[in-house]
């Protein structure tokens, strides 16, 4: 019995002779194991995976991206992520590639007064690029914190407006940097950090701590930049702060970018 031949349309030549910078898949969820200071944690990541496509090719082999994820069963760290990136480019027979892996990352925290323990989640992204045989890795964390307005505190007889804020730190490093370390930098420079669970005594503590440590978004990004400037492991960084204003229907925002290798 003869088997029916199935046409491989994407492998035929393309006559338009226009190269594509990125082609691949987006928003595919996959379980992963991430190395952390306590060992390994299990989470679910959302992947974006792309490679370049030469001008004479009609399409990429989309199924190969999914095959790669299902074949990869190692604990993901900076080193294994780079190997995954290089392997993707080789498997897709491309010259350049990009992988973005975004996932919730959990850290156990202890309430400041009661000592009650809870988990706190953070948004973390691994970003890998390879071009002309050279790879670049970026680590990004988004840290929710509390911010309290210095102006509001100064002009008010009682209290000051405060709100939840997001501090984002993206780095390129020459040595290993723990995710927890970046998160700690952001929390230390905020008006106050957040906790998954607080009792009344803890609520009093965090309220008073924020009141004693007011900061604009400009203060937050400058203070964090000062810490990153002193860290010799970090070659480049981007720091962002966004306050979801409690007295306005808009956000306050600030950003600092620095490439130490160019300065």
From Swiss-Prot:
Q: Which GO terms describe its molecular function?
A: GTP cyclohydrolase I activity
User: One of this protein's GO BP terms?
Assistant: tetrahydrofolate biosynthetic process
Question: Could you say which residues are annotated as the site May be catalytically important?
Answer: 149
Q: Which InterPro entries match?
A: GTP_cyclohydrolase_FolE2, GTP_cyclohydrolase_FolE2/MptA
Query: Is the keyword Hydrolase assigned to this protein?
Result: yes
What highest taxon heads this organism's lineage? Bacteria
Q: Which UniProt keywords apply?
A: Hydrolase
Catalytic activity from the UniProt record = GTP + H2O = 7,8-dihydroneopterin 3'-triphosphate + formate + H(+)
Q: What class of enzyme is it?
A: hydrolase
Q: In which pathway does it act?
A: Cofactor biosynthesis; 7,8-dihydroneopterin triphosphate biosynthesis; 7,8-dihydroneopterin triphosphate from GTP: step 1/1
Look up the EC number in the record and give it: 3.5.4.16
Cross-referenced HAMAP family: GTP_cyclohydrol_B (MF_01527_B)
- Could you say which protein family the record assigns here? Belongs to the GTP cyclohydrolase IV family.
What does the record give as the function of this protein? Answer: Converts GTP to 7,8-dihydroneopterin triphosphate.
Q: What is this protein called?
A: GTP cyclohydrolase FolE2
Q: What organism is recorded for this protein? A: Nitrosospira multiformis (strain ATCC 25196 / NCIMB 11849 / C 71)
Q: What is the lineage of its organism?
A: Bacteria, Pseudomonadati, Pseudomonadota, Betaproteobacteria, Nitrosomonadales
